[in-house]
C-alpha cells in the first residue's frame, strides 16, 4: 500500500505539481490519483522514477511511502 500523505508531503516539499509528477512517472494524473488511492499499485519502474525525481528523499521515507505496512495493517482491521 502507498502512504498518500507522505507522498504528497514530498511533492509539496520540493514544490512540484501533481501533473509534473504524473508526467515524470509516465502516467496520467488520473492514474497517479488511482495509485495514491490504492486502487492499483505502483510498479517497480514507477517507484524508481519517483526516486530519480526526488533523489534527496531518504531510503527510509521511500520505504514508508511505497511499502506502508501500518496502513496495510489498519486496512485489514
Where are these regions (language model features)?
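DNA major-groove recognition helix of helix-turn-helix/homeodomain DNA-binding modules
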Residues: 45-61
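Short acidic alpha-helix initiation/capping motifs at coil-to-helix transition points
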Residues: 1, 40-45
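A short, Lys/Arg-rich alpha-helix, primarily the initiator
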Residues: 1-20, 24
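DNA-binding alpha-helical recognition surfaces that contact promoter or target DNA
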Residues: 9, 34, 52, 64
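Short, charged recognition helix plus adjacent turn
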Residues: 15, 60-77
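Recognition helix of helix-turn-helix/homeodomain-like DNA-binding domains
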Residues: 27-42
Amino acid at each position: 500500500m502507498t502512504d498518500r500523505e507522505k507522498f504528497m508531503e514530498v511533492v509539496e516539499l520540493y514544490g512540484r505539481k501533481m501533473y509534473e509528477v504524473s508526467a515524470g512517472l509516465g502516467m496520467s494524473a488520473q492514474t497517479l490519483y488511482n495509485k495514491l488511492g490504492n486502487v492499483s499499485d505502483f510498479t517497480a519502474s514507477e517507484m524508481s522514477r519517483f526516486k530519480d525525481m526526488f533523489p534527496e528523499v531518504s531510503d527510509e521515507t521511500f520505504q514508508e511511502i511505497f511499502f506502508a505496512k501500518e496502513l496495510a495493517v489498519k486496512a485489514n482491521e
